[in-house]
A protein has these predicted regions:
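Flexible loop linkers connecting adjacent transmembrane helices
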Residues: 35-60, 82-84, 88-92, 104-136, ...
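Alpha-helical membrane segments and immediately flanking helix-loop junctions
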Residues: 54-86, 112-115, 121-129, 133, ...
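N-terminal alpha-helical transmembrane segments of multi-pass membrane transport
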Residues: 1-74, 84-91, 102, 426-467
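Extracellular loop-to-transmembrane helix junctions
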Residues: 7-43, 85-123, 302-310, 345, ...
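Helix-loop-helix module between adjacent transmembrane segments
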Residues: 25-30, 98-122, 128-129, 133-163, ...
């Protein structure tokens, strides 16, 4: 009953609300920024290659490479394979479309996060909650957004992540549908709890080191296997474009169409316009907000157009046909096995264990920040203990739940964030657009752009950009 209700809400949100909002806002800012995705692409590369500001500082290029490698996970691997199995080859095309138009939305929201960021003891912080309160003057809406983010990352994404991790074990003979998910969920919950309650520093350090390495290995394997099966690529591309524009199939069952799955899984992977990336963008130390807007825009392209496409091509050129029964980890494992043999399932399992574990901890970091915003202070030890215990229980339950429910729940909660953030960035886009023009003028004058809020008409007192 609950699963069917959540599924119906998800279908309604993405069939009638989010598809219009995501495309409309993306196209709107693509036009308002005068195709910033293409026009400033060369400048984006220049920003990425800028030297760090200090001897101990991390360069933009290093930060981007580490974050990109670390983002290879459930969204890029299992999310894309699920989209292909349930939505067909055409889902890949609509995933590309959402990444391209979504890049403009990502540029705006991350630039806003930089403009309105706050000064903290250990650097800057911010995100949608902060620009909603500072620029719109609505703490109530900011709190609602924070609650939506807590629900999305602390519940929806972590439950889905736990499910996706345990689903990689389906390929093994010892897997028992009734017991194995709960056993794996229990082990995962204990490990996460061990790290959350003050221990596990070595575990966190080890996984943080291994994840970027495994990310690079995964991307390399995906490209190599695609090259091995390069003769299949023309046929695959033909299916992608033909199915993407099979309008009879699309509109006869829109909720299950390639458009819908392309949008859902693309959004889950790159999060453009959702309002999560600005939380990380606000922490960057740059001379001009637009620099971080460009970096986050490029991150969307790398995440979807590069990494997700690598997964899609690796699977689709393998000769293994995507069917509903293989949705999720089994399709990736079966596709890899066609070229790598039995080692494929072990490779995917090890990859997902590392990716999922760090994702679970990273998601809870976002949650911590939102609780701090809502409570106007860092939560006390008793609150943290209760919340972290609940977080572990949520992970355990997620591992033993059904695939359909977990994806639908994550989609609905993520959609709630987007429904709040997209109208907000439409209302507040003015300062970001003015900042972009200010940046362009300084670059045309041969300067390294330095932002001063008053230069674009922002008169309110900000923690940064005063002079």
């Amino acid at each position: 009953m609950f699963a069917s209700i959540v599924g119906a809400i998800s279908n309604f949100m993405y069939s009638y609300l989010l598809i219009v909002m995501l495309v409309a806002v993306g196209l709107y800012y693509t036009l308002r920024t005068r195709l910033v995705q293409l026009r400033m692409f060369k400048e984006t590369i220049r920003v990425i290659l800028e030297k760090p500001v200090g001897a101990d500082a991390v360069s933009s290029f290093q930060a981007l490479m580490v974050s990109t490698a670390s983002r290879v996970g459930t969204g890029n691997i299992i999310g894309i394979s699920t989209a292909i199995c349930l939505g067909g080859y055409g889902a890949v095309f609509w995933m590309w479309v959402m990444a391209i138009v979504g890049g403009a939305s990502a540029f705006i929201e991350s630039t806003l996060a930089q403009i309105y960021k706050k000064r903290g003891e250990h650097g800057s912080y911010g995100g949608p909650a902060y620009y909603i309160e500072a620029a719109l003057g609505s703490r109530a809406l900011a709190v609602i957004f924070s609650i939506a983010l807590i629900a999305t990352y602390g519940v929806g994404f972590n439950m889905l992540c736990a499910y996706n991790l345990q689903s990689t074990f389906i390929a093994y003979s010892f897997y028992n549908e009734a017991t194995t998910p709960w056993v794996i969920g229990g082990i995962l919950a204990v490990l996460v709890g061990y790290c959350l309650f003050g221990g596990g520093r070595r575990v966190i350090a080890a996984t943080s080191t291994l994840v970027p390495i495994m990310g690079v290995i995964y991307i390399s394997v995906a490209f190599v296997l695609t090259l091995i099966n390069i003769d299949q690529l023309p046929a695959v591309l033909g299916k992608i474009f033909s199915q993407a524009f099979d309008f009879q199939a699309i509109f006869s069952g829109f909720a299950g169409s390639c458009v819908m799955f392309g949008i859902k899984r693309g959004l889950y992977s790159n999060e453009a316009g959702v309002g999560s990336a600005p939380n990380a963008a606000a922490a960057a130390d740059v001379s001009h907000p637009v620099k971080q807007g460009l970096v986050q825009m490029l991150s969307v392209f790398i995440d979807t157009l590069l990494i997700c496409t690598a997964t899609a091509f690796m699977c689709m050129t393998s000769g293994v046909e995507p069917v509903k029964e293989l949705a999720g980890a089994p399709y990736v494992q079966t596709a890899l096995a066609a070229s790598m043999g039995g080692v494929a399932k072990v490779f995917i399992t090890v990859s997902m264990v590392l990716f999922a574990f760090t994702t679970l901890l990273g998601n809870l970091y976002y949650v911590d920040n939102c609780f701090a915003y809502i409570m106007k202070a860092v939560p006390g030890p008793t609150f943290n203990m209760v919340y972290r215990a609940i977080a572990c229980v949520v992970i355990f339950i997620g591992a033993g739940s059904s695939m359909g429910l977990m994806w639908d729940l994550a989609d609905v909660l993520m959609g709630c964030m987007a429904i709040i953030n997209l109208p907000v960035i439409c209302i507040l886009g003015g300062p970001a657009l003015k900042a972009m023009d200010d940046y362009s003028k300084q670059r045309e004058a041969g300067k390294n752009p330095v932002f001063v809020a008053k230069s674009i008409g922002i008169t309110q007192k900000l923690d940064y950009w005063q002079k």
